Structure formats: C-alpha cells, structure tokens
C-alpha cells in the first residue's frame, strides 16, 4: 500500500511539473521555431502609438489574402504575415486581424491545397492565437477545431517520400496550433474531448519522429486534453 501511495505521488508530481513547464515550452518553441519562419532580426516591442501602422499593413495584406485572382501561395504568405502582425501588434492588432481569419478558415477547408500552403495558413493561426484568449475564443467560434481535426482524419495514399513527409509535417503543425489554442482554454479542451478518434490519432503521431521540434506536440496536446486520465 505504501508503495502504491508513493507511486501515485510520483505521478502527480510529474504531472504538476509538466503543466508548470508547458507554457515555457510553448514559448521556447515559438522563439526557436515559429519566429524563424517570419523574422531574421531581433524584434522590438511595438509601442501602442504604432498600432495604426500594424493595422495599415494588415489591411494591405488582407487585400492580398482576399484577392482570388492571385496565386494561392501568395495569398497564404499574406495570411502568415497577418498572423505575425497580430502577435507583434498586441491585442488591438489581433482584433483587427480577426476580420481576415474567416478567409483563412475557408482556405484550410480546401482539400486540393498542398500541405505547404496549409502550413502557411496554420502558422497564421498560431501567431494570431498565441497567448491571446480573445483570439482563441474567436478561432473556436470560426470552427477551426473541427477544421484542424479533419487533417488527422484524412487519408493520404501517396508512396512518394517527400509527399508523405509533407503530409506528416502538416499534422505536426496542426498539433502545435491546437496546443496553442488549448493552453489555458477549458472550452477548447472540452470540444476536443468530444472528438472520440482524436485520442488514437495523437497516440499515433506521438510515436513519430519529432526531431527538430522543441517538443513532441502530439504528446503535449494529448496531455492538455486529459486523455492520459482515461
């Protein structure tokens, strides 16, 4: 009995430490991996007086995103930059960027889009939602959760290694975005729990090679949702 209590104590100490370090790991991944896609120079904090500068740039990029006559990759790159501006510009810029996230959600539902295009769009959502509860709530209302979960459920039958790797990378980014949306957001946790097949998908993805990432975000998401308790 004493050994049993000791074992339980060890488990709960480990769980507490995992939760305590989760935000730090997300922040580390942000600094090491996500920012590398957008900026080469060290960023400065944006004074509130420069909010309008962010809004003006978001408007210009929004016009590119919404222009259906442009190549889809250029539109996705514009969405990616909108997400970054939403993050660096603080809550006001995040609110302004929200106007264009419905289009991002719409594009992500296009099954014909290549994984690299969808990854650009996912990076936009990650930036927009990062440590921003208002954006997380808006993303949930725009049905991003079922849209993203569909990426786990889709079947990909190519035998070309580069294509299968791209598809796997898309799933990795999906795990990261859902982790960002779920951290400190109980409503997102509850919705994710309702997807019965998600536990299986995360278990399979957790077994993949996550080298190059600061964390195995399939495991992180699995733990955040609470699947380990079942």
Curated annotation (Swiss-Prot):
Pfam family membership, one? ARMH2
Which PANTHER family does the UniProt entry name for this protein? ARMADILLO-LIKE HELICAL DOMAIN-CONTAINING PROTEIN 2
The protein, known as: Armadillo-like helical domain-containing protein 2
Gene field:
ARMH2
């Amino acid at each position: 009995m004493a050994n049993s209590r000791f074992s339980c104590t060890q488990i709960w100490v480990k769980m507490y430490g995992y939760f305590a370090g989760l935000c730090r790991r997300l922040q580390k991944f942000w600094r090491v991996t996500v920012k590398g896609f957008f900026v080469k120079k060290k960023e400065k904090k944006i004074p509130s007086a420069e909010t309008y500068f962010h809004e003006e740039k978001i408007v210009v990029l929004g016009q590119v995103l919404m222009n259906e006559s442009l190549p889809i990759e250029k539109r996705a790159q514009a969405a990616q930059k909108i997400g970054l501006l939403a993050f660096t510009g603080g809550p006001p810029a995040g609110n302004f960027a929200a106007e264009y996230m419905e289009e991002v959600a719409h594009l992500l539902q296009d099954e014909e889009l290549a994984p690299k295009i969808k990854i650009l769009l996912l990076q936009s959502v990650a930036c927009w939602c990062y440590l921003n509860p208002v954006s997380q709530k808006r993303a949930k209302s725009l049905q991003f959760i079922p849209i993203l979960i569909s990426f786990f459920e889709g079947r990909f039958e190519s035998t070309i290694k580069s294509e299968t790797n791209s598809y796997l990378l898309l799933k990795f980014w999906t795990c990261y975005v859902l982790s960002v949306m779920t951290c400190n957001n109980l409503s997102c946790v509850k919705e994710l729990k309702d997807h019965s097949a998600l536990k299986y998908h995360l278990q399979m993805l957790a077994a993949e090679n996550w080298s190059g990432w600061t964390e195995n975000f399939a495991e992180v998401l699995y733990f955040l949702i609470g699947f380990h308790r079942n």
